[in-house]
């Protein structure tokens, strides 16, 4: 996520634009001894863990491989999101995370309020990206979040939006070639 080892401010941890693997996090155990209820109510544990520790100060990112992450595990939370009603699961995830961020905001006495609001907005936008809600993805409201996407992601969003038939044909062809 970052190009070198560096200090990451608490504000950046809360309102992060990049992802770092949970398995690479090193946290002080005292931060995790008495966890608030919103940690347990949240469907994922990595983000609450990160922002809870941010209440106590900055973090440090070490730019090297720290662990190995198993990908494609069928029983993982991520894999479970792709079965059934994907749009509903994405909306449920967003609502759950929104509640967690709001509880964290209160728990941290609103010290990071603007970062929490920005993180909620980014998460809402990324939910729209995941379900391909082009009206919202391309709206002025999410202009800054759209700019944060890499060129490849922005290209494919516009390709799919403006030329859906061609996009589906190319996608179908590419998937058949993978097999």
Regions found by a protein language model. Name each.
Residues 1-14, 116, 169-178:
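Short secondary-structure boundary segments
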Residues 1-83:
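Conserved nucleotide-sugar donor-binding catalytic segment
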Residues 5, 42-45, 85-96, 118:
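Soluble or luminal CAZymes and related metallo-dependent hydrolases
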Residues 45-46, 115, 162:
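Short, conserved alpha-helical segments within structured domains
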Residues 67-73, 79-110, 134-146:
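Catalytic core of nucleotide-sugar-dependent glycosyltransferases
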Residues 111-118:
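Short, charged, amphipathic alpha-helical segments
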Residues 118-124:
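Acidic helix/loop microenvironments that form the catalytic cleft of cell-wall polysaccharide enzymes
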Residues 124-179:
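Membrane-interface aromatic/basic loop that binds lipid-linked glycans or pyrophosphate carriers
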């Amino acid at each position: 996520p970052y190009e070198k080892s560096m200090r990451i401010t608490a504000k950046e941890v809360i309102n992060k634009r990049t992802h770092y693997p949970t398995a690479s996090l090193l946290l002080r155990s005292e931060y995790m001894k008495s966890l608030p209820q919103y940690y347990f109510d949240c469907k994922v544990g990595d983000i609450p863990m990160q922002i809870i520790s941010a209440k106590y100060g900055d973090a440090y990112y070490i730019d090297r491989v720290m662990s190995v992450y198993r990908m494609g595990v069928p029983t993982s939370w991520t894999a479970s999101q792709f079965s059934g009603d994907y749009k509903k699961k994405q909306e449920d995830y967003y609502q759950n995370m929104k509640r967690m961020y709001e509880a964290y905001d209160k728990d941290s006495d609103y010290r990071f309020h603007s970062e929490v609001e920005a993180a909620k907005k980014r998460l809402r936008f990324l939910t729209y990206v995941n379900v391909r809600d082009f009206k919202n993805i391309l709206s002025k409201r999410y202009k800054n979040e759209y700019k944060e996407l890499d060129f490849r992601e922005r290209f494919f969003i516009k390709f799919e939006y403006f030329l859906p038939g061609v996009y589906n044909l190319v996608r179908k062809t590419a998937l058949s070639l993978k097999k």
